Amino acid sequence: MLKFTEEHEWLKIDGDVATVGITEHAAGQLGDLVFVELPEAGASFSKGDSAATVESVKAASDVYCPLDGEIVEVNQAIVDDPSLVNSDPQGAAWFFKLKLADPDAANALLDEAAYKEFVA
């Protein structure tokens, strides 16, 4: 299941684990990324908490935790090469995997059609 937030994060949900990243729209707005800071595996976040930071030549921005949960894995590849976020934001450049405290809460997030309408 693919879901989106109004803060421009995407979530690919598989059971009780969501892979989280920023959308193509967000990556395009930020421009070329030069730095990514990710949370530590094992850290717990509530929905809306700042979980990661990205810096581009234009601005620094927070990446928010889309739902309550615990970080179970981070993508070291985007720390080593932030430009991956620009080239494949909704694929290889995921940010972290989140074990969801309440997987059903994802139903309240936007689906792809609603997100496309939101950014149109």
Curated annotation (Swiss-Prot):
Keywords: Lipoyl
Needed co-factor(s): (R)-lipoate
Superkingdom of this protein's organism: Bacteria
Keyword rRNA processing: no
Family (UniProt): Belongs to the GcvH family.
Subunit structure and binding partners: The glycine cleavage system is composed of four proteins: P, T, L and H.
Protein name, entry field: Glycine cleavage system H protein
Organism for this UniProt entry: Rhizobium meliloti (strain 1021)
Encoding gene (name): gcvH
